[in-house]
Amino acid sequence: MSNHDQKRDEGYIEKLVQVNRVAKTVKGGRIFTFTALTVVGDGKGRVGFGRGKSREVPAAIQKAMEAARRNMIQVDLNCTTLQYAMKSAHGASKVYMQPASEGTGIIAGGAMRAVLEVAGVQNVLAKCYGSTNPVNVVHATFKGLKGMQSPESIAAKRGKRVEEII
């Protein structure tokens, strides 16, 4: 697992989560291709992930970064943490995330940590169950973050005040 991060001109934080080598066997030998999984975020609630494939690692990473910028979502954060505890799953990967008090930090493993860091979450407790395949863990984390709503948006949908729903 690689954890490469850098800042770009647009103000996005980019993290390389995984590079995988795949070999296709043909008559003349093996053909190697590389798959890259990246996450991109602005540190203020916008986050995206992407996958790229190429015969060379830098090209695969570049394709993944472009895909991640096209696939961005907005996450409603509660200051530096999540709104509420949540569970999410993708394939055999299951993730659990819960808000944490100030000063806790990001207590999460591998691929989940990368997503939460670039999203701007600074205090969270998270656990991954089942498969720890980085692709499925990132998908499951995104499903959870995408479904999270602020109390203000829930109240607006119901036509009530925030105090009435809390």
Curated annotation (Swiss-Prot):
Any Gene Ontology CC annotation: small ribosomal subunit
Sample GO molecular function, one term: structural constituent of ribosome
Keywords noted in UniProt: Ribonucleoprotein, Ribosomal protein, RNA-binding, rRNA-binding
Gene3D superfamilies for this protein: 3.30.160.20, 3.30.230.10
Presence of keyword Calcium: no
GO biological process, any: translation
Start and end residues of each S5 DRBM domain: 12-75
Key word S-adenosyl-L-methionine present: no
Binding partners and assembly: Part of the 30S ribosomal subunit. Contacts proteins S4 and S8.
Recorded domain comment: The N-terminal domain interacts with the head of the 30S subunit; the C-terminal domain interacts with the body and contacts protein S4. The interaction surface between S4 and S5 is involved in control of translational fidelity.
Family from the record: Belongs to the universal ribosomal protein uS5 family.
Task performed by this protein: With S4 and S12 plays an important role in translational accuracy. Located at the back of the 30S subunit body where it stabilizes the conformation of the head with respect to the body.
Record's protein name: Small ribosomal subunit protein uS5
Organism per entry: Pseudomonas savastanoi pv. phaseolicola (strain 1448A / Race 6)
Gene from which this protein is expressed: rpsE
